[in-house]
């Protein structure tokens, strides 16, 4: 996920773990950032991966007893426990690059479509079977509640919500796609100046939006691709059939960081509220990125 959302977490009393679901968002038009239920899956549904993440100061390593308790708390929805690691490069003696491994535990559902990674400084929940924001937020909060129950979350440094979408449309008779029919004009790049006889087939773009004061930000990465946005060896299973044709990538990363370098106290209610407030600009920008023709097509699927 990219950088980061201003909420005064410290302005309200800290709340302990609870199991009540997040408040329902008010209906404000069509929810385009949804997929289908498992028995309604369309091969061209745009959502490939959704991630919610909370970054926090380093927590104590899980002990044998706390690991057992965490596994028990997550066993109903994420019963499979796996060991995982992230690799990073640092500078070793003499300035030579040295790989370092960040090892952590990951809990997965039986369909291998939802994963919760509990790292020393982050709680990351991902899904390839996204249905809607509220349902996924409930899953995320179950994980956060379980983590907070076995080891206190002492502060919040970043909250993020990320959508990786693959927009697929029919290929023309010449085997190409005129993305101008489907994608909003500002995202089409230099297609309009393509020399005669040549078609623009590749470009990448990025845009960063921030509040005037530190707080919410949104990064959009976009451009056409071939195949899939996710690596074929990604640790989660795709619920849609593999496709190798052209698609248009929309990577929408909405996030929050506290102002002034502060590390506000963790508050469950405000975490849920922040996730909701991050969802709204993601929803808005997604709809703005599509032409009316593509919106109508997605609604028919």
Language model features: what each stretch is:
Residues 132-134, 138-157:
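Secondary-structure boundary elements
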Residues 242-301:
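Long, compositionally biased interface segments
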């Amino acid at each position: 996920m990219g950088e980061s959302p201003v909420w005064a977490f410290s302005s309200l009393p800290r709340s302990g773990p609870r199991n009540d679901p997040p408040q329902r968002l008010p209906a404000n038009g069509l929810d385009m950032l949804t997929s289908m239920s498992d028995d309604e899956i369309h091969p061209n549904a745009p959502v490939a991966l959704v991630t919610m993440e909370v970054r926090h100061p380093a927590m104590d390593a899980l002990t044998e007893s706390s690991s057992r308790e965490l596994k028990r708390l997550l066993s109903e929805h994420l019963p499979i426990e796996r060991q995982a690691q992230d690799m990073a490069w640092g500078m070793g003696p003499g300035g030579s690059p040295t790989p370092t491994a960040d090892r952590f535990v990951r809990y997965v559902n039986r369909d291998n479509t939802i994963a919760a990674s509990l790292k020393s400084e982050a709680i990351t929940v991902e899904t390839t079977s996204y249905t809607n924001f509220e349902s996924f937020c409930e899953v995320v909060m179950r994980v956060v509640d379980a983590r907070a129950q076995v080891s206190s979350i002492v502060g919040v440094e970043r909250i993020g919500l990320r959508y990786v979408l693959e927009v697929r449309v029919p290929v023309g008779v010449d085997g190409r796609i005129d993305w101008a029919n489907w994608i909003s004009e500002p995202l089409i790049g230099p297609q309009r100046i393509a020399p005669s006889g040549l078609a623009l087939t590749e470009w990448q773009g990025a845009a960063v939006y921030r509040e005037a004061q530190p707080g919410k930000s949104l990064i959009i990465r976009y451009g056409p691709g071939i195949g899939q946005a996710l690596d074929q060896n990604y640790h989660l299973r795709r619920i849609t059939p593999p496709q190798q044709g052209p698609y248009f990538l929309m990577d929408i990363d909405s996030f929050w960081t506290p102002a002034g370098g502060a590390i506000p106290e963790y508050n469950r209610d405000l975490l849920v509220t922040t996730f909701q407030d991050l969802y709204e600009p993601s929803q808005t920008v997604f709809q703005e990125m599509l032409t009316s023709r593509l919106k109508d097509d997605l609604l028919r699927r």
